[in-house]
């Protein structure tokens, strides 16, 4: 999975897909009451990027629904995964449950259209810190209460704050989540980061019977040397400001026979068995 990073303006979706991304990440900003308002990162952000691009969240969902719906004029077959970077660290943890309700309802109304949409992308909920785990509980409660629990099959969970892996496991255990879990490891492209935690996450992913990590990706990679390092370690995905660079690295002799771009037929919730 090549995840285009910080794709917050509607016009950026095609831009990143044209560069080779098959997944996009966008930031969701909330008001003080936990209501999702806009797709927006804000300052500071990655080096060399404009931090202020934005869209109204519901309008963004309306557009991305078309882009991921077969037979729609806007359909782009390669886009198979949407990563929602939930900016919950900007609001009180007491509002995390309300935020989960709101995002679930907006996905129901504007993306899935309560069963009337054929939009097919998988959804990855990126939560910054484990302290905001009530977002997940609310999201799942809302799907159940609204009568659309089946959409859980399309939704995965990821904590992105580089927290202790065992601490994350404990929270997932509290929530009763033992599948459809991704793990991210990384830092803004402005800085370098070691591989200790990334290696630990990959080791846990590959441990038989360990059900708290199905996929691991590294972020935000812009240098080809770091992309190569991550691929050698065996990541499932790379988040980048430059998907075209990832494509070029994947075509190199060292990687061409080991990796390929994920398609809709690849289940993002299953561990890869090479």
UniProtKB/Swiss-Prot annotation:
GO terms for molecular function: lyase activity; metal ion binding; phosphoric diester hydrolase activity; toxin activity. Expressed by the venom gland. The keyword Lyase applies. It is found in: Secreted. Binds 1 Mg(2+) ion per subunit. It catalyses: an N-(acyl)-sphingosylphosphocholine = an N-(acyl)-sphingosyl-1,3-cyclic phosphate + choline; an N-(acyl)-sphingosylphosphoethanolamine = an N-(acyl)-sphingosyl-1,3-cyclic phosphate + ethanolamine; a 1-acyl-sn-glycero-3-phosphocholine = a 1-acyl-sn-glycero-2,3-cyclic phosphate + choline; a 1-acyl-sn-glycero-3-phosphoethanolamine = a 1-acyl-sn-glycero-2,3-cyclic phosphate + ethanolamine. Its EC number is 4.6.1.-. GO terms for biological process: killing of cells of another organism; lipid catabolic process. Its cofactor is Mg(2+). InterPro entries: PLC-like_Pdiesterase_TIM-brl. Coiled coil: none annotated. Keywords: Cytolysis, Dermonecrotic toxin, Disulfide bond, Hemolysis, Lipid degradation, Lipid metabolism, Lyase, Magnesium, Metal-binding, Secreted, Toxin. Disulfide bonds join 45-51, 47-190. One of its GO terms (cellular component) is extracellular region. The active site is at 5, 41 (nucleophile). Mg(2+) binds at residues 25, 27, 85. Dermonecrotic toxins cleave the phosphodiester linkage between the phosphate and headgroup of certain phospholipids (sphingolipid and lysolipid substrates), forming an alcohol (often choline) and a cyclic phosphate. This toxin acts on sphingomyelin (SM). It may also act on ceramide phosphoethanolamine (CPE), lysophosphatidylcholine (LPC) and lysophosphatidylethanolamine (LPE), but not on lysophosphatidylserine (LPS), and lysophosphatidylglycerol (LPG). It acts by transphosphatidylation, releasing exclusively cyclic phosphate products as second products. Belongs to the arthropod phospholipase D family. Class II subfamily. This is Dermonecrotic toxin SdSicTox-betaIIB1ai. It comes from Sicarius cf. damarensis (strain GJB-2008) (Six-eyed sand spider).
């Amino acid at each position: 999975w090549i995840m285009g990073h910080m794709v917050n303006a509607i016009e950026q979706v095609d831009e990143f897909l044209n560069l080779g991304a098959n997944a996009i990440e966008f930031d969701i900003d909330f008001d003080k009451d936990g209501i999702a308002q806009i797709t927006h990162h804000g300052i500071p952000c990655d080096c060399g990027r404009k931090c202020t691009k934005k869209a109204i969240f519901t309008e963004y969902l309306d557009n991305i629904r078309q882009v991921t719906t077969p037979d729609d004029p806007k359909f782009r077959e390669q886009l198979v995964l949407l990563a929602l970077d939930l900016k919950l660290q900007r609001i009180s943890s007491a509002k995390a449950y309300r935020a989960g309700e709101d995002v679930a309802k907006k996905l129901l109304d504007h993306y899935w259209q309560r069963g009337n949409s054929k939009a097919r992308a998988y959804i990855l909920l990126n939560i910054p810190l484990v302290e905001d785990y009530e977002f997940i509980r609310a999201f799942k409660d809302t799907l159940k209460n609204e009568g659309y629990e089946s959409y859980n099959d399309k939704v995965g969970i990821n904590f992105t704050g580089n927290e202790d892996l065992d601490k994350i496991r404990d929270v997932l255990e509290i929530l009763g989540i033992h599948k459809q879990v991704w793990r991210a490891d990384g830092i803004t492209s402005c800085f370098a980061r070691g591989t200790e935690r990334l290696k630990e996450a990959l080791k846990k992913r590959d441990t038989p019977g360990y059900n708290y990590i199905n996929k691991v990706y590294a972020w935000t990679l812009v240098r080809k040397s770091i992309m190569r390092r991550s691929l050698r370690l065996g990541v499932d995905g790379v988040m980048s400001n430059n998907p075209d660079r990832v494509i070029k690295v994947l075509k190199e002799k060292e990687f061409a026979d080991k990796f390929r771009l994920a398609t809709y037929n690849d289940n993002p919730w299953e561990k890869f068995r090479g």
